[in-house]
Amino acid sequence: MKPVLVLAILAVLFLRLADSVPRPLNVVVSEIKSAHFRVEENQCWFHMGMLYFKGRMSGNFTKKHFVNVGIVSQSYMDRLQVSGEQYHHDERGAYFEWNIGGYPVSHTVDMVDITLSTRWGDPKKYAACVPQVRMDYSSQTINWYLQRSMRDDNWGLLFRTLLVYLFSLVVLVLLTVGVSARLRFI
């Protein structure tokens, strides 16, 4: 009973420490000074080593415009371009929507760039999104979370990752030992 109490106290302390570290927020950085285009929604997050992002941009669009969503990393070799936008036109005007989920990325990804261009023009960065890290409870992505926390010096994420992983191992061992002990006496 005492080890369980000690583990519970340590879990509360680690989770409080993890919550005291500020997490990255969704950031919208407008770089085109124009009243013609507006970002209405811009969200991105990491979950299970995958990148999810969705958003909406409205303005004076024509079919010649297109929005490109790119993933920016610390290394230039990881500069990826992801295209999943959809052009819409209704009574409120023209807008672009993107909803890209489950894109596998390395732990070095820093930002999602949203660029706006025409078919003949150079793309201009219009907005950016800094992904939030959403913790999961699977051991498949433990390595990704450990690398990300060490790269960012995010001690809260490191402690949460280790705590969740160790807790899942303890539960697995207790279940395995309990099942094998029950089977032995049946």
From Swiss-Prot:
GO terms for cellular component: host cell endoplasmic reticulum membrane; membrane. The keyword Membrane applies. It holds the Pfam family Cytomega_US3. It is found in: Host endoplasmic reticulum membrane. The signal sequence is not cleaved. N-glycosylated; mostly exists in a high-mannose form. Residues 1-20 form the signal peptide. The chain crosses the membrane at residues 161-181. Keywords: Disulfide bond, Early protein, Glycoprotein, Host endoplasmic reticulum, Host membrane, Host-virus interaction, Immunoglobulin domain, Lectin, Mannose-binding, Membrane, Signal, Transmembrane, Transmembrane helix, Viral immunoevasion. It is a single-pass type I membrane protein. Residues 182-186 are cytoplasmic. InterPro entries: Herpes_US2/US3, Ig_E-set. GO terms for molecular function: D-mannose binding. SUPFAM superfamilies: E set domains. Residues 21-160 are lumenal. Glycans are attached at N60. Disulfide bonds join C44-C129. Belongs to the cytomegalovirus US2 family. Monomer. Retains, but does not degrade MHC class I heterodimers in the endoplasmic reticulum during the immediate-early period of virus infection, thereby impairing their transport and maturation. Forms a complex with beta-2-microglobulin-associated class I heavy chains, which accumulate in the ER. In consequence, infected cells are masked for immune recognition by cytotoxic T-lymphocytes. This is Membrane glycoprotein US3. It comes from Human cytomegalovirus (strain Merlin) (HHV-5). The lineage of its organism: Viruses, Duplodnaviria, Heunggongvirae, Peploviricota, Herviviricetes.
